[in-house]
Amino acid sequence: MIYDVRQETIYNYDSPVAYAHHVLRLTPIDRAHQRVHAAALDITPTPIERREGQDFFGNRITWIAFDQPHDTLTVRVAARIAVEQAVAVEPGDTPPWEEVREAAFASADPSPQAPAHFLFPSRQVSLDPEIRDYVTLSFPPGRTILAGATDLMNRIKAEFVYEVGATTASTTPPMSFALRRGVCQDFTHIMISGMRSLGLPVAYVSGYLRTVRSRGETRLEGADAMHAWALVWCGPVVGWIGRASCRERV
């Protein structure tokens, strides 16, 4: 399946900004079952400096700088991406979560996809005892890693409320957990925080959600949305599997 993606991001400042530096991570990348045929960024106003590169994990980065007053910044993304349907992995075909934890801490793999990079707290995801206790209920002794992650995903979908505006980009996992509401970013952070508290590698992924319209319904531009989900490491044989703990209303 080939998708044409268009995204427009607009920043409005309270007062003109004379100097600004930004780091953009908006360009899709090639990965398993995904190939980028074309991608372009259009930035208004035109930056005085623009550099392209990639980070340690392979994400494409654009650095931009401005030296003239401006009160609005607009970034437009256009991309054509080919996506192949991945072969589904049954939860019962993955190892027990305790074995995955042992394998993660024993791994000496230094590559960007290694589990060691996704075991510990970060600036965005703290480890919280209340979240750990909540997540522990999904991981009784001997349950397979993907069965536990799927159970946790379904519990969050059932017990938390998807509400735009209830949180912000700076909301921490303990804050959204206490609220029991938020958006896909918040629910993904809760899932990551809790599973990492158990010693399980989980990564954060952002991308796009394609909605499915009813038969005869016209697809409206803007009906689809940016999305975030968790990648769960299921051991060295199975690798990384995605789980979305978000109740979307689009």
Where in this protein do the model-derived segments appear?
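Intrinsically disordered, low-complexity N-terminal segments that are enriched in acidic
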Residues: 1-106
